[in-house]
Amino acid sequence: MKLLSRDTRLVCELALCPLALVFWSILGVRALDNGLARTPTMGWLHWERFMCNLDCQEEPDACISEQLFMQMAELMVSDGWRDAGYDYLCIDDCWMAPERDSKGRLQADPQRFPSGIKHLANYVHSKGLKLGIYADVGNKTCAGFPGSFGSYDIDAQTFADWGVDLLKFDGCHCDSVVSLENGYKYMALALNRTGRSIVYSCEWPLYLRPFHKPNYTDIQYYCNHWRNFDDVYDSWESIKNILSWTVVYQKEIVEVAGPGSWNDPDMLVIGNFGLSWDQQVTQMALWAIMAAPLLMSNDLRQISSQAKALLQNKDVIAINQDPLGKQGYCFRKENHIEVWERPLSNLAWAVAVRNLQEIGGPCPYTIQISSLGRGLACNPGCIITQLLPEKVHLGFYEWTLTLKTRVNPSGTVLFRLER
């Protein structure tokens, strides 16, 4: 099936009455304030792995259906994903029927979701999980299903009535900047008015940046997390592009991240087909450093034990979920090596050394301990543990010493430093 590009934007005009505009001006900075996502969201999202597969006759195990999500829910419990922290099961595009119902409400495709979304939400909740769903700010979703333009209130209430816990709100089919921004703000208010706690995942800056620089202070008022860059694909080139974009724009985005508000570099594709082992380690390590939502998109029925162990690595997850809530950043790039760091609670730090080369063998690299954590991480000394690609207790290092490591091509070594 040929999908409409997520970059496709058709005209949608949002006609807001003066009263609504006054309402926004009063409540704008408190529009979200939902107390959710105090640490980055963790879970599973169908899009990258299963896309918009609607053919349940030919591919019953891979089409977007309630069967797929119920199977994933079962595995998230039985295989330890929920206990590791992955507690959101998220539906992306292509779950809807082609038309709204007679009352103007969104409805699930009756053949692929015969029991409806409320039933699925109840099932997911019975497993101790939470359900995420997808909608779009414009006239249509990216795949051409009904959009939420003009129906923000009724859609928000529908999701609340169903028991939805997260909304991923896309930005296709809306090429008016005013419409785009107002639509995202209005949906935040509409979700709050339902009285239900619903994590709000936006793609606002992704669609805004081609027109002007996003106001991230504004965006963080309304969204729990937000996409900045292109969709991730199951390829190393895609991961590299996301990381390169992040380094270029980190001065804009790092400071606005924190409890309840996160930059989202998109899904984890670990356990699929396109990344080598070292590249999977790099994605896991850098997503932890970036305090990114950890939303896997893979097939939990077929995932390898090695990929599962990486995704469930409790030490790496602890860095990602650190309650201090500070996003990490790249602070050094020399030749083909990048060094990233992230401040953690209790004066700890995470440090990642990434090898940009894709040829040759492991690259030796030496770090001055005094340079880490803005000179504070190991002053006067610290205990260093290598967490990835394997856990190694390296011991106590004084501030005046050096740390030597070797990093595989396209790989990353992740350390934790504790005072």
UniProtKB/Swiss-Prot annotation:
Active site, per annotation: 170, 231
Leader sequence residues: 1-31
SUPFAM superfamilies, per database record: (Trans)glycosidases (SSF51445), Glycosyl hydrolase domain (SSF51011)
The EC number(s) this enzyme carries: 3.2.1.22
Glycan-carrying positions: 139, 192, 215
Annotated CDD domains: GH27
Residues modified as Phosphotyrosine: 186
Organism phylogeny: Eukaryota, Metazoa, Chordata, Craniata, Vertebrata
UniProt gene name: Gla
Compartment(s) of residence: Lysosome
Protein's recorded name: Alpha-galactosidase A
Major localisation: other
Gene Ontology cellular component annotations, sorted alphabetically: cytoplasm; extracellular region; extracellular space; Golgi apparatus; lysosome; membrane
Family, as annotated: Belongs to the glycosyl hydrolase 27 family.
Classification via Gene3D superfamilies: Aldolase class I, Golgi alpha-mannosidase II
Regulation: Galactosylgalactosylglucosylceramidase activity is stimulated by saposin B and ammonium chloride.
Pfam families found in the cross-reference section: Melibiase_2 (PF16499), Melibiase_2_C (PF17450)
